[in-house]
Every structure is written in structure tokens, then in C-alpha cells.
Amino acid sequence: MLLNRFVQVCLLALACSSCAGLRSSSGVYEIVREPLKAGPRRIHLIYARPLRPTHPDYLVVFATGDGGWRSVSSDVFEHLAAEGYQVAGIDSSRALRPVLRAGERMSTTQATARVMAALADAKGDLGLPESTPVIVVGFSRGATLVAFAALHPELRQAIGGAIALGLTREVDYLRTPRPERVPEIQVDSRGRVQIYPALKLLGSTPLAVIQSTHDPYVPAAESRELLGPDTPTLRLYEVDARNHRFGGARDRMIADVDDALRWILASRGE
């Protein structure tokens, strides 16, 4: 009996570690964890179910940075939930750990299959129609999901808008076979897909990039050079912050996320 109890406690602790720091908010939203089978490892999707959804016709998918459910990632996820969005979250560090440890890269075809499966699971678990448009939001490595969504036609059709926070320069977990490379898909000397050129493939899909002025990877000024001027489908928000995690300006970053979401919804006639 004692052994069984010990095993149950260990399993509960392991399960909770996948969404550490995220808590339901009484009367506002409920945090729910559901397993997603992806390759040889079991990972989880974390759902925020608002008690009174403000945008029931949309699904927001949030991908964390390497730190998992901490810092910017937990702040943004919980804010979206409090605002009434139906959110499905994934811990990028856990999802990509086997790939990064193996020192290999997934093909865009393999990655697309996994992402499409995750989107289907999320819509099913939340009771949403298959046709529900998805708004992708990600921080740091999780923001590369935005670029990945641009790479594959099937994913592009499923995305209704995208917000990238702390966007880095390259994707280090994907490979694009030469036959799949259109001119917008560029790789560096190490074969890593370059994010900013790939964003052009999003076409008419509204994209917002939120970047810190002192981001050590790609500061906001350089992001502006890479993106060019704002357009009807592209916006760059430059946040005067200390570092990659928007230190000293977290509230400003959250306000920009809200503005970007309003802009995306307005561009879709909402």
C-alpha cells in the first residue's frame, strides 16, 4: 500500500512538472493537462479553458521558450487565459529535447505532421470545429514555431495570425531537403533555417514581432532592418527593455501582445 502511494505521488509530481507554475484562476479559467503522443516520448498539451470565452471562434496556441513555463512564457499564457482566449500551450524544451539531444534535425514534413496532430488534438479536446482558425504565439525558441508555420503550405492554411516574442535568427531543429527549398527558405553554413527570410512565406497572414531593444540575439533595431517597414500584414513592436526576457518592461510587452491580437482579429473582420 505504501509503495503504491509512493508511486502515485511520483507520477503526480512528474505530470505536474510539465505545467509547473501554471494554476487555474477561480471563476476565470481552468488549467487542464492532456497527453499528446509525439514520437517515442509522451508530452502534454496544457489548456486554459476560460469560464467565459471572449473569442470562442479562435484557438490560440502558445509555445514556450527554453525555460518552459516560467518568466515570459507563464506571464503571457496566464494573461491570454485571463483575457478569455482558449489557449493550448506546449513546453518547447520538453517537446524538442529528444531531437536536440540526438544532434539531429527533423524534416519539415515530420515536424508538420506532429504540429498538425497537436492542433487536431487541441481542437478536439476543447470541443472546437476542425475549421477553427489558429493564432500562433511563441516566445524565444517557441517563437520559431511562427517561422515553421510559414514553411509548410498545409500549416500556413491553418494559421489565422501569428505573434513572435523575442524572435531569434535561426531554427536549429529543422532541416529542409533541397527539393523543398523555395527562394525564401535560406540556410546558413550549418544548415540552419534562417527565420526572417522565411517569414515572407506567410503572405497575407498577419504577423506581429515583439522584440526587446536590448535582446542579445536580435535587438529590435536589427529586427527592423531584417523585416523592413510595417505593412498591412506585418507589425514590429519595439520594447525598451533590458534583455531577451523583456526585463523592466514586462507590462509594456503584455500590452503589445494585446494590441497585436486586436490587430490580427480586426484584420480578419472581427
Tell me the role of every PLM-derived stretch.
Residues 22-55:
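N-terminal cap/lid segment of alpha/beta-hydrolase-fold proteins
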Residues 52-85, 89-92:
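Short, surface-exposed "cap/lid" segments of acyl-processing enzymes
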Residues 81, 214-235, 242, 247-248:
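Active-site-adjacent alpha-helix of alpha/beta-hydrolase-fold enzymes
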Residues 91-109:
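Cap/lid segment of the alpha/beta-hydrolase catalytic domain
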Residues 104-128:
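Alpha/beta-hydrolase active-site loop
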Residues 123-182:
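Primarily recognizes the serine-hydrolase "nucleophile elbow" in alpha/beta-hydrolase
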Residues 172-224, 228:
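The feature captures the conserved acid-bearing segment of alpha/beta-hydrolase catalytic domains
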Residues 232-270:
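C-terminal catalytic histidine-bearing segment of alpha/beta-hydrolase fold enzymes
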